[in-house]
Amino acid sequence: MSSNGSLTKDEVVNIIKDWNFSWSIIFLLITIVLQYGYPSRSMMVYVFKMFILWLLWPASMALSIFSAIYPISLASQIISGILAAICAVMWLAYFVQSIRLFMRTGSWWSFNPESNCLLNVPIGGTTVVRPLVEDSTSVTAVVNDGHLKMAGMHFGRCDYDRLPMEITVAKPSVLIALKMVKRQSYGTNSGVAIFHRYKAGNYRRPTIIQDEELALLRA
């Protein structure tokens, strides 16, 4: 450092080198999460993505509060205070909606920050729950060699002949029921079925068996 307190050229270059390595790792992780962070691709990466999204609210609020307490100017203090209030209100709204959805479904997927829709499919005496990113009046089920996929997501093993006749989509304010309207087999224990919305109401979905749900998430 020079006598007047400013950094020398070599010190600036060394700092850039250090941060360049760190940011290269950070951006690589962000790229992986954005590229593969979908339930239809990798459930493990998707859960990691949800964890990062969940941490962004308190991190944003903490930074805004810190900027409001230690401002660089009066304008930045006012703006930081407004941003902190907005973060707090939105985070509270997220928890309210998530708790309402949890009371309706009993699934920890209710706290998914990316979606407030849950697809509930009864299979083999339990109900498998997956987050539904896109809301739709119809859902397509594909069974390939005894393995079920719905809305692009894996639901584990399920025989084509044992497909449920009704599935549900849960939201914080409503539970939507979809019934099978068409099915077509195309091989041994394989086929396609279409479920279409036919009723909605303010009622709860039957509780799930948590251990089996977690086991399916790890599958």
Swiss-Prot record:
Residues 1-18, 71-78 are virion surface. It is a multi-pass membrane protein. CDD domains: MERS-like-CoV_M (cd21567). The chain crosses the membrane at residues 19-39, 50-70, 79-99. It holds the Pfam family CoV_M. Keywords: Glycoprotein, Host Golgi apparatus, Host membrane, Host-virus interaction, Membrane, Transmembrane, Transmembrane helix, Viral envelope protein, Viral immunoevasion, Viral matrix protein, Virion. GO terms for molecular function: structural constituent of virion. GO terms for cellular component: host cell Golgi membrane; membrane; viral envelope; virion membrane. It is found in: Virion membrane; Host Golgi apparatus membrane. HAMAP family: BETA_CORONA_M. Belongs to the betacoronaviruses M protein family. Component of the viral envelope that plays a central role in virus morphogenesis and assembly via its interactions with other viral proteins. This is Membrane protein. It comes from Bat coronavirus 133/2005 (BtCoV).
